[in-house]
Amino acid sequence: GDEIQVRGGGVGLSAADYEEVTIMNTSPRFLKAMNLSERAGKLRIPVAKIILGKIMGSGVGSGNCHRGSLDIQATSPEMVKEYSLDTIRLGDVVAVTDYDATYGARWQPGAITLGVVTHGSSYASGHGPGINVIMTSPSGVIEPIITRKANISEILNLP
């Protein structure tokens, strides 16, 4: 049979001083490049946009956020306008409030989940721009800091 070799970087990553933060689907190189900081017991992380958990769609209730994407519902033109969803770009790092992805995707007041936008919008009900989770905290110890430079291409200096 054929032989393959799989190399993984970042599998099992954790934030030493933040036990309630789960890191997934990312690499040590990307985390270092994100310029994380700490203040008042919170892990401050640059994000391009903050999304309300109540507008999340496809993926809610999934049992595993280590694969697949979670969609921001964008089928309603009114919702797109109200939440400026048309400004989301591929590669943006976004924060989802009141949303925990530690052991699957679920609504939880006070939780924060971070993800990278990996696909565009959709006309299918409950779908829209999709994010792959990179970090989550059920206790909200993550503090998102808005900056338009929070995009994977800027963070990693990609052409």
Predicted regions span which residues?
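Conserved mixed alpha/beta catalytic, RNA-binding, or beta-rich assembly cores of soluble enzyme
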Residues: 1-159
